[in-house]
Design a protein with these regions (language model features):
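Membrane-interacting alpha-helical segments
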Residues: 4-22, 26
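Active-site and donor-binding regions of nucleotide-sugar-utilizing enzymes
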Residues: 20-212, 230-231, 245-260, 269-271
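Donor-nucleotide binding loops and adjacent catalytic segments primarily
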Residues: 69, 75, 82-84, 89, ...
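Acidic donor-binding loop of glycosyltransferase active sites
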Residues: 120-124, 312-344
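Conserved sugar-transfer catalytic core signal across GT-A, GT-B, and GT-C glycosyltransferases
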Residues: 136, 234, 324, 347-348, ...
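Hydrophobic beta-strand scaffold residues
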Residues: 145-147, 288, 359
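Catalytic binding pocket for nucleotide-activated donors in carbohydrate/polymer assembly enzymes
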Residues: 176, 330-404, 408-412
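C-terminal alpha-helical cap of glycosyltransferases
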Residues: 416-435
Length: 435
């Protein structure tokens, strides 16, 4: 074991002796208390099954497709699913009832990870995308539980951080660790970090494994431009698009009915984003429609969108609920890819593309470059260098009559990138990791 890894183990072991005493300071149902808990009812309920770990809400969405594939392949539910955020936990429990026993992931302390492994006795640990936590991996290996990175990706920043900390290499990622990489670049990074070539396969991106809709809504049913996964720093883009769309239709002499009047729907990535969007648009003088849990309980999303789009003054709506963004894309003529107009690397454009919705992305799209490139090559996506350009493209696409061609291009690209779950299961068979 290298010096960096030994130091990390020593420090976290010491923290594991004192931090659990602080668990009582948090709410009984809070993430803090859950993160300091090892053995749990969820572990016992899923004993002997597979442990799936997904960092946050976005990864939980990918994990859902993996869990569905595992259960359909014969894995006995419930599986254990852990996540590090409250919103991720809520999504897992809402979207996978009966299929997973979900809880907050333990902190990366040897004692808490070991206790959960001992209570759950998983047959395998599947880490969705990238969460390289040394104790999680080492304790799983110690318990002879294979670790598989699923839809795995390693950014250049993560690789540099692991090397700087001195925790990369076969001491961490040696025997018992496998990678189902998202693409060739990720596969090369996993190999460089210490996973042998024979235990690395390119399987693809789980976020591309979206079910094909039974029918793609026609242009006339699409009343909105949807800014999905809106992040801090993207306010200028959202405001520029709102201004470009404001007043279209009536001023151009077109009928004052949807979809002649574009509705901008902003769906924040995190809860605090709703307040930020509210302040932004209210400060600019827009009448803002908002959908939260209360509205969701009494009105369907299509009805809410139709009502917002037909309002005399409403030009902007905020979607504050969790789990409704995919359905919102069914009613969008244009999707703006969040996390690409501020340095976050981008969120998947495939969720919108798989619904037949063309996408516009900004300059910060390195994390989704492959998917975005595939959609753009056939005309289903555009890359805008700045907020003004994004607004101009959105306005042009709204009225130029090219929706059908762009929609079909986006659908074709999304379907061509699917199959990650199937290829992953085939690799597990070859590695003899199927329980």
């Amino acid at each position: 074991m290298g010096a960096g890894l030994a130091v990390y183990r020593g420090l976290t072991w010491g923290l594991g002796l004192v931090l659990p005493a602080a668990a009582g300071l948090g709410r009984a149902d809070g993430a803090w208390r859950g993160a300091l808990t090892g053995a749990s009812a969820e572990g016992a309920a899923s004993a002997g099954s597979i442990w799936v770990h997904a960092a946050s809400m976005g990864e939980v969405g990918a994990a859902r497709r993996w869990v569905d594939a595992l259960v359909e392949a014969g894995v006995r539910p419930p599986l254990l699913l852990t996540t590090r955020t409250r919103t991720g936990l809520e999504r897992a429990r809402r979207e996978m009832p009966g299929r997973v026993a979900a809880r907050i992931a333990p902190l990366d302390l040897p004692q808490t990870v070991r206790a959960l492994l001992e209570s759950a006795c998983p047959s395998r640990l599947d880490v969705v995308e990238t969460e390289v936590w040394p104790n999680l991996i080492l304790e799983a290996r110690r318990a002879r539980v294979a670790v598989v990175f699923v839809s795995g990706t390693v950014s250049a920043r993560t690789e540099r951080r692991l090397r700087a900390l001195g925790v990369a290499g076969p001491a961490l990622l040696g025997n018992g660790v496998f990678a189902l990489a998202r693409d060739d670049e990720a596969a090369a990074r996993f190999r460089a970090l210490g996973i042998p070539e024979a235990r690395v396969r390119v399987a693809g991106d789980l976020k591309a494994d979206f079910p094909s809709p039974a029918a793609v809504p026609a242009e006339g049913e699409r009343v909105a431009v949807v800014f999905g996964s809106f992040r801090p720093g993207e306010e200028a883009t959202a405001l520029a698009i709102a201004e470009a769309l404001h007043g279209m239709g009536v001023e151009e002499g077109r009928p004052a009915t949807p979809p002649a009047r574009p509705l901008l729907v902003v769906a924040p990535r995190h809860e605090e984003g709703a307040a930020r969007a509210r302040r932004l648009f209210a400060g600019a003088g827009y009448a803002v429609f908002e959908r939260g849990a209360a509205e969701r309980s009494v009105e369907t999303l299509p009805a809410w969108l139709s009502r917002a789009a037909s309002g005399a003054r409403t030009r902007v709506a905020i979607l504050s609920t969790h789990g409704e963004l995919p359905e919102a894309y069914d009613h969008a003529r244009v999707a703006i890819v969040g996390g690409t107009f501020a340095p976050f690397g981008g969120h998947t454009p495939l969720e919108a593309a798989s619904r037949g919705c063309p996408v516009i992305a900004g300059p910060y799209h390195d994390a989704v470059a492959r998917a975005l490139g595939a959609i753009a090559r056939d005309g289903g996506a555009a890359i805008a260098p700045d907020p003004a350009s994004a607004a101009a493209v959105a306005a042009s696409w709204w009225r130029d009559g090219g929706f059908a061609a762009r929609s079909q291009a986006a659908l074709r690209a999304a379907r061509s990138l699917g199959g990650a779950a199937r290829r992953g299961l085939e690799a597990l068979e070859a590695w003899r990791l199927v329980p």
